[in-house]
Amino acid sequence: MDTINRRIRVRFAPSPTGPLHIGGVRTALYNYLFARQHGGDMILRIEDTDSNRFVPGAEAYIIEALEWLGIKFDEGVGYGGRFGPYRQSERRDIYRTYVRQLLDSGRAYIAFDTPEELEARRAEVPNFQYDATTRGQMRNSLTLPAEEVERLVAEGTQYVVRFLVEPNVDVEVNDLIRGRVVIDSSILDDKVLYKSADDLPTYHLANIVDDHLMEVSHVIRGEEWLPSAPLHVLLYRAFGWEDTMPRFAHLALLLKPEGNGKLSKRDGDRLGFPVFPLEWKDPQTGDISKGYRESGYLPEAVVNFLALLGWNPGNDQDVMSMDELIRLFDIEKCSKAGAKFDYEKGRWFNHQYIQRKDNAELAELFRPILRENGVVATDEKTAHVISLVKERVNFIGELWEQAGFFFIAPLSYDEKTVKKRWKEDTAKQLGELAELLDSHRSFAAEATEPTVKNWIETNGYHLGNIMNATRLALVGESKGPHIFDIMEVLGREETVGRIRRAIEILG
């Protein structure tokens, strides 16, 4: 199996059975990093062979989510390419050809056993599986006369095509993460490859045929597919494609924060974090699940966070851009063990990226929140405000919590703060401060601060009392950045107006 001189081609092949789970996002990301690092191609293939589980809107959701995260494709659904179509439901004729090839070569057979008959066998025989020891007792083209098989097919009797697994064959799987694994084919069952009921192949056949025809060089997927890898190797052999079989890499699971089991939506609901990249509305129940985007995460933070769940660059660096991840990523250094999902670390990453992001870009993201609150502000003012408060926030949505008072004057004052900060002589002193500020020429922080502090010292007032009471008047509580920075943003008229309004209300 020589892949040294092959062009690197990987695929992300989700099924449109619901929203893309964050574990699936990580799989897409690792494929993307690997492809870009090697100058290869990234393919988007939609594996929609299971019509019973198809969910309207899921395919569009998957594409939008990956675009938001900056995971780009070179070909596939929505991108085109010379190996299309890339939606499996549109490749029926192709699959039929290869089903027939397996039947003609004796590597597969037709089985007519009904679901009820199979269920009865399972009830009779503990751990029953359809394999070399049982296929001779079942209703299939190996046990029925050829003319009866032809008659049943011609009459429209529903059937499946099963792969004929030869027993006592060593099947070797070379995994880039887990190393060399050899299993005895005798433990494998004769998997269904095709169902006449819907004229579609199962995952196993479609997957192998598509990867071969699309010249996929590496299959990077979740470890839930590891038990199927020996079957896939046997299918490559059956078709005579072993020399061009892709290299496999099976990624360890994302685990619950406690480490006991696979991460699920229920864990997110229980602990208060998203498990989907974007908000998802279930078309059947109408239930809405929050996404990372709607929760205020930056896409680059999500990418960085996910990249380090199951892989690390071998140094102390945590914060890495997509370009840095592409340069450093090594599929063979991915962990064999599952990675605990540390949602607090995700918050930390988002905080780091908010600090690094340009204030003008953050202002663009903050604008919809301002609109929701009835605020119209200049880009310049919004960016200035963000520069003052962003070190206190982990998410875009928290900007309003920290900065809303810059845009809307407080309608009330925190009772505890009033009791603690509003003294008997506060109204008189703030009245004098309002007069001073109203006559001050420049309202830049570096101009007002020395003037106010000099006035406080000259009058023998207490600096802390004046500053705390002024903050209460301007903000409504004891929070916010440097008080003179607040004054500068608010401007003379608004600052003086808020101080005088507080005096009027609090007395």
Curated annotation (Swiss-Prot):
Q: Which domain of life is it from?
A: Bacteria
Q: What is its main location?
A: cytoplasm
Q: Identify one Gene Ontology CC term for this UniProt entry.
A: cytosol
Its source organism is Porphyromonas gingivalis (strain ATCC 33277 / DSM 20709 / CIP 103683 / JCM 12257 / NCTC 11834 / 2561)
Its subunit composition reads: Monomer.
Q: What does this protein do?
A: Catalyzes the attachment of glutamate to tRNA(Glu) in a two-step reaction: glutamate is first activated by ATP to form Glu-AMP and then transferred to the acceptor end of tRNA(Glu).
Q: What is this protein called?
A: Glutamate--tRNA ligase
Gene name on record? gltX
Annotated compartments: Cytoplasm
Q: What class of enzyme is it?
A: ligase
Name the Gene Ontology molecular function terms of this record. ATP binding; glutamate-tRNA ligase activity; tRNA binding; zinc ion binding
Where is ATP bound in this sequence? 265
Q: Which CDD domains match?
A: GluRS_core
